[in-house]
Amino acid sequence: MATPSISHRLAEAAVALFDENGYDETTVDDIAARAGVSRSTFFRYYRSKEDAVFPDHDTLLATVDARLRASTADTAIVAVTDAVRIVLAHYVEDAEVSLRRYRLVGRVPALRAREIASVARYQRLFREFIGEWLAGSPDADLRAELMAASVVAAHNQVLRGWLRAGGTHDPFPPLDHALGYVIATFRHLERPQDGKDQVVVATFSRSASPQAVMEAIQDHLGSRP
Amino acid sequence: MATPSISHRLAEAAVALFDENGYDETTVDDIAARAGVSRSTFFRYYRSKEDAVFPDHDTLLATVDARLRASTADTAIVAVTDAVRIVLAHYVEDAEVSLRRYRLVGRVPALRAREIASVARYQRLFREFIGEWLAGSPDADLRAELMAASVVAAHNQVLRGWLRAGGTHDPFPPLDHALGYVIATFRHLERPQDGKDQVVVATFSRSASPQAVMEAIQDHLGSRP
DNA sequence: CACCGTGATGACACTGAGTATTGTCAATAC
DNA sequence: GTATTGACAATACTCAGTGTCATCACGGTG
């Protein structure tokens, strides 16, 4: 259409003004004026000034939630990696906007706080999903918490690297690497299929003393009480 | 002294009023009036309404920072666990206040956001410290990010459990368990001392097929590229 | 064509957080 | 005794966010 949606015009006006004049210096009136609507209309589309910077977070969160829920215990790991890829893909799709927002968020504490809060919402989602997946196994809550935190941290690390590099390279190989790392690290979280068919690998240095071997074994056993 | 510090009176008045009348329903004027000072005095002691709920976060953060900086690469793990214990100890010291705040934060989204932001600051601190510690090793940034996230997640999991239980039990054994778990999980993050003297443990199910063993080994190797 | 319901928008008023400025008073220094 | 400093109060201001009501465009209906 000739005139893009009001919602989109508002978001664009907001980011442009924040960029030009600074966040605190820009009033909602300014944004509404630039978008050619009234102040009240702004608040009809966005609950707050910050909201205009993160227009589609709720949608994305719902998408991730849906992807996680559309899986069984057998496909949990795939669901998690898929969900993370969805999020990253969302940033990559609109690299222009993502980069501008990244620079903006870096300069405005209020926006940084907002972003951190939304990251926490993803982490909570993953935690709940993984918690259900692991339910019944020992330390399920703890493990779910740790794995959710790691998954989200891995995503953020890759995303930040991509943003800092100016959104130039393809971030999915790094993401796969990072997620592979997380999954390998947490592989022993998976519930043993039938309790007897586990495969575990151990190697010993030929020069290792029996004491050193014992300590390694104790550490290993100590982590699964 | 007969009259406690104004700062303390303000914080107490704030939490009391938030408890009685709700957060949004309480104005800064109310808080100041209850503390027997003027509105402007409130803002002299706290930058915002939320600040009054988390009076000593900055101090605690500085303490943690100091503890981390007062360590070398050799003692990094001890420093991390110590730092986490400092934080938990701070909550336990004043269980009364911690519990009241926990209930309050659970009900007020604005406070929850604030708390999440301060958790992020701890995580950042740990990430930087661990990053320096691992500097030079492959994937140092990624590993630092993951371990910091896990350490913080472990702490929060234990803290939440303690708070939900009403602050009754001693949370340090659970913390040790959780941290032990994290450290065991990330043990292979430690840089090998001299590259040849590692001790690694591997066990195989007697019924495992050679293929299963090979897969396990490949997974193991895949996590250290 | 006149009428009517509906949904989007604007105009406006109000509350309250946070800031900045200025004034006042008391303690301490000199 | 006077000057300086610092803690607090008083006041006015900006602006985010909420709520209410009027207006206008519109599509359908009689």
Task: Give names to the regions the model predicted.
Chain A
Residues 21-23, 43-55:
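HTH DNA-binding helix-turn interface
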Residues 109-135, 142-150, 157:
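Amphipathic alpha-helical packing segments from all-alpha helical-bundle domains
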Residues 139-162, 172-188:
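Hydrophobic alpha-helical segments that form the core
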Residues 62-103:
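Hydrophobic alpha-helical connector segments
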Residues 30, 44, 153:
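DNA-binding alpha-helical recognition surfaces that contact promoter or target DNA
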Residues 1-21, 25-37, 62:
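Basic, helix-initiating cap at the start of DNA-binding domains
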Residues 164, 168-225:
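C-terminal peripheral helix-coil segments that are non-catalytic and often amphipathic
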